[in-house]
Amino acid sequence: MYRTLLKSKVHRIKITGADLHYEGSLTLDEEIMEAANLIPFEKIEVYNVNNGQRFSTYVIPGVRYSGECILNGAAARLGHYGDIIIIASYAAVNEKDLESFKVNLVYIDENTNTIKEKKEVLALNSKVLAKTNE
């Protein structure tokens, strides 16, 4: 059986721009993408802390070290410059791989939109795994 688990999270990044007439997607600083283990065109979920909007799109690389986070296409209507968002990506993980599965958590400095801290954590501890396998 497969379980859907959080794979990557970019926590509290500020929107730095919007381009309504771009094809679509979210443009994200390439350094932040790499830290979060996100690849170009990967599906992401976006949660806008300021207005409560939640939507799906895909991520494309922006200029490295720029701190950019740009909503493109229809998504540009769902957030404004300066809004704080959370970006999440999920993965289907086989139960036999749960013990080695790692989540990438990237925390953003709210003043500069650069990486404040990155953590790789085990998604599940042994007690949870024991309950899952019973």
From Swiss-Prot:
Organism superkingdom: Bacteria
Keyword tRNA processing set for record: no
Catalytic reaction(s) noted: L-aspartate + H(+) = beta-alanine + CO2
GO molecular function per UniProt: aspartate 1-decarboxylase activity
EC code: 4.1.1.11
Pathway: Cofactor biosynthesis; (R)-pantothenate biosynthesis; beta-alanine from L-aspartate: step 1/1
Keywords, alphabetical: Autocatalytic cleavage, Cytoplasm, Decarboxylase, Lyase, Pantothenate biosynthesis, Pyruvate, Schiff base, Zymogen
Cofactor, how bound (note): Binds 1 pyruvoyl group covalently per subunit.
Gene Ontology cellular-component terms listed: cytosol
Cofactor or coenzyme needed: pyruvate
Subcellular location: Cytoplasm
Subunit composition and interactions: Heterooctamer of four alpha and four beta subunits.
Described purpose of this protein according to its UniProt entry: Catalyzes the pyruvoyl-dependent decarboxylation of aspartate to produce beta-alanine.
Family: Belongs to the PanD family.
Record protein name field: Aspartate 1-decarboxylase
Protein source organism: Sulfurihydrogenibium sp. (strain YO3AOP1)
Lineage, highest ranks first: Bacteria, Pseudomonadati, Aquificota, Aquificia, Aquificales
Record gene name: panD
